[in-house]
Amino acid sequence: QIKLLLPMWPVADSSFDTASYVRYAKQRFLTDSLMKWMFDQYTTDPQQRREVYVSPLRDTDDELRGLPPTYIQVAENDILRDEGEALGRRLSEAGVDATTVRYNGVIHDWGMLNGLAALHQTRALVLSSAAMMQYYLGTDYIGADRSCEEIDFISEQIG
């Protein structure tokens, strides 16, 4: 049984037409042309792109209802931001325990980019994700009983 969904900067629709798609289409890390290319690698069939597994924003409340608690994290400067936030709203409307957090000043995938590892947004992403896993899964996480200095040291060792 899945106890928690933890999507980071999720793809939730194949329409490519949200305000964040328009605003960040050419000027940030993930561009609209790259996103369209990635969709083409999956399928070029418009019908398949509308299927719920590809575009969960198109799911009905009945299809969404019963999903596990969901903690969505999005980047402010990301073409996927609006659909991630819309997914959080849709899940909540369907009765799912859903939380969406927007991290200001960062781009798509920032939490996985070594050059951005020192940002406070990256640290918040990692620690809040770990805290949610501990809460829903009952597991220990790196920050549970450690000081900021210990976490910084561990982060440096990891890379």
Q: What kind of feature is each model-predicted range?
A:
Residues Q1-G159:
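Alpha/beta-hydrolase superfamily serine-hydrolase fold, recognizing
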